[in-house]
Regions:
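Positively charged n-region of N-terminal signal peptides that target proteins for export
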Residues: 1-5
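Hydrophobic h-region of N-terminal signal peptides that target proteins for export
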Residues: 11-21
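Surface-exposed, glycine-biased beta-strand/turn segments
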Residues: 19-98, 105, 125-134, 139-140, ...
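Exoplasmic/lumenal beta-rich domain surfaces
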Residues: 98-133, 212, 217-226, 255-317
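Compositionally biased low-complexity segments at domain edges in trafficked proteins
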Residues: 189-210, 350-377
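Short acidic/polar inter-strand loop motif in beta-rich domains
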Residues: 248, 328-336
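Short beta-strand elements
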Residues: 333-351, 356
Length: 377
């Protein structure tokens, strides 16, 4: 048995690596429980300072549901913490993936005896244990634990992950488990945000949209219809949206897996939450409108990348610009939302678009990003 201080996190500074294309390898994964699978949270949901890294399976409101290994493999790690994942079990599989089971109440007798021996040896409830390939083998369908509510859990459930064993990136378990879960519901958009950037914001660094002189308009959406009037636009603009996904036979709300934005039928932005590294999960404050979250606890996902200008549109003609959002979940349910922005050159004044001189979003977000980059560099 090997004792290690913690997991080694990948250092991926390149922004494009935040949402890499997930190489899909077919695997014979079974469900971790033998009760009807219902989710309370899905992969990639927006959380405070991070993306949700797995699926939260409901356990019918109680602790003590049997948990089974989803495939053959070996226990590679047992972790016990007062917070976070609580009591968690990690199983490496020959197919190159690791399954993770968190917030457990207790382990099977065979695994629990190993855990207790280590806790007595270290004289500590909190332990982080690592094992070699031949120490604790398990078979697919073998009972390994009981569900619980340990650690930072807000109620009884099983937090379940699939990781790339080599890189430790987390991957959306619904890539394998979507056929097991009923979902006939489309994502829904609740609001559309339009950002208009002052011309000087791009003179020195095109794509740098964190200017303090940015005008933002937010229009609510209900039943896929705008509930207000969109602004006239000119110059460099970008968009954002507030949206959630839904599933059949449950009242929970979930994160949207795939967001695509089109201008005149040409895709100008794509966000696919299929896989990410734990280092890059902190970029959530970079792709969301932090002002809306800090002041109103509202998640607006920005449909542009400030570092390279992807998703930014230059409005330079007085005409209609036709946009289309396509939001999809892992089951293929797709919501299409079409809207038009009118390009209209403003009257020449000192502050023609009414850009605010101070933007809370810029101040908060700029400081947040600077702190993040200082940690990474």
């Amino acid at each position: 048995m090997k004792h290690k201080a913690g997991l080694t996190l990948l250092f991926l500074l390149c922004w494009l690596s935040l949402f890499p294309k997930a190489p899909f390898v077919d695997a014979d994964f079974r469900l971790p429980m033998r009760i009807p699978p219902v989710l309370s949270a899905n992969f990639g949901e927006l959380r405070s300072d991070h993306f949700h890294s797995g699926l939260d399976f409901k356990t019918q409101g109680v602790i003590g549901k049997s948990i089974y290994s989803v495939a053959d493999g070996h226990v590679s790690r047992i972790s016990v913490r007062k917070y976070g994942y609580g009591k968690a079990l990690y199983i490496d599989h020959p197919n190159g993936y690791t399954s993770v089971y968190a917030h457990l109440e207790y382990l099977s007798p065979r695994l629990d005896s190993v855990l207790r021996a280590a806790q007595y040896e270290e004289k500590s409830y909190e332990v982080n244990l690592f094992f070699d390939t031949d120490e604790l083998p398990v078979k697919q369908g073998e009972w390994i634990a009981m569900s619980g509510n340990t650690g930072g859990s807000g109620g009884p459930h099983l937090h379940f992950e699939i990781r790339d064993t080599q890189s430790e990136d987390v991957m959306d378990p619904l890539l394998w488990y979507a056929p097991y879960i009923k979902d006939l519901a489309k994502p829904r958009i609740q609001a559309l945000a339009v950002y208009q950037f002052a011309p000087e914001a791009h003179q020195s660094a095109p794509g740098d949209c964190l200017s303090p002189r940015t005008k933002k308009s937010i229009v609510n959406i209900a039943d896929n219809q705008l509930q207000g009037t969109l602004p006239k636009v000119w110059g460099n603009i970008a968009l954002g949206l507030k949206a959630y996904d839904y599933m059949s036979d449950t009242h929970n709300i979930y994160g949207v897996q795939l967001i695509r934005l089109f201008l005149d039928d040409k895709e100008i932005f794509r966000q696919d939450l299929s896989r990410f590294s734990f280092d890059n999960t902190r970029y959530i404050n970079y792709i969301t409108d932090y002002e809306e979250w800090a002041l109103h606890r509202s998640w607006i996902m920005r449909s542009y990348f400030p570092h390279n200008g992807q998703g930014i549109v230059n409005i330079s003609e007085e005409k209609d610009y036709h946009f289309r959002y396509e939001l999809s979940d892992r089951h293929g349910n797709t919501q299409v939302f079409r809207f038009t922005l009118r390009g209209e050159k403003p009257m020449p004044t000192d502050n023609s678009l009414g850009y605010p001189q101070v933007d809370v979003s810029h101040d908060i977000q700029q400081k947040s990003i600077k702190r993040l980059l200082q940690k990474l560099l």
